[in-house]
Amino acid sequence: MINIFSFICIYLHSALYSSSFFFGKLPEAYAFLNPIVDVMPVIPLFFFLLAFVWQAAVSFR
């Protein structure tokens, strides 16, 4: 269980800070998309959490 928690923490840390260190800025014409691009790395985590919500809805059958 601790390994899953560590993986999630590392994923969130890299998702929050990687855009400022490893990637350049978007071109000026696409600057209005910056908020969306900042959230995009976290989207797979939402699907991961959705799997648990779905299983809870069907009582973990």
UniProtKB/Swiss-Prot annotation:
Q: Write down the superkingdom of origin.
A: Eukaryota
Under the heading InterPro entries, the entry gives:
PSII_PsbK, PSII_PsbK_sf
Q: What is this entry's stated membrane topology?
A: Single-pass membrane protein
The record's subcellular locations are: Plastid, Chloroplast thylakoid membrane
Q: Does the UniProt entry include the keyword Mitochondrion?
A: no
Q: Which UniProt keywords apply?
A: Chloroplast, Membrane, Photosynthesis, Photosystem II, Plastid, Reaction center, Thylakoid, Transmembrane, Transmembrane helix
Report the SS bond pairs.
none
> Which coarse location class describes where this protein primarily resides?
plastid
The Gene Ontology CC terms held by the record are: chloroplast thylakoid membrane; photosystem II reaction center
Q: Which SUPFAM superfamilies match?
A: Photosystem II reaction center protein K, PsbK
Gene Ontology terms: biological process: photosynthesis
Asked if the Swiss-Prot or TrEMBL record annotates the protein with the keyword Plastid, the reply is yes
Membrane-spanning intervals of the chain = 40-60
Summarize the protein's role.
Answer: One of the components of the core complex of photosystem II (PSII). PSII is a light-driven water:plastoquinone oxidoreductase that uses light energy to abstract electrons from H(2)O, generating O(2) and a proton gradient subsequently used for ATP formation. It consists of a core antenna complex that captures photons, and an electron transfer chain that converts photonic excitation into a charge separation.
Q: Which PANTHER family match?
A: PHOTOSYSTEM II REACTION CENTER PROTEIN K (PTHR35325:SF1), PTHR35325
What family classification does the UniProt entry report for this protein?
Answer: Belongs to the PsbK family.
Its quaternary organisation is: PSII is composed of 1 copy each of membrane proteins PsbA, PsbB, PsbC, PsbD, PsbE, PsbF, PsbH, PsbI, PsbJ, PsbK, PsbL, PsbM, PsbT, PsbX, PsbY, PsbZ, Psb30/Ycf12, at least 3 peripheral proteins of the oxygen-evolving complex and a large number of cofactors. It forms dimeric complexes.
Q: What is this protein called?
A: Photosystem II reaction center protein K
Q: Which organism is it from?
A: Pelargonium hortorum
Q: Report which gene this protein is encoded by.
A: psbK
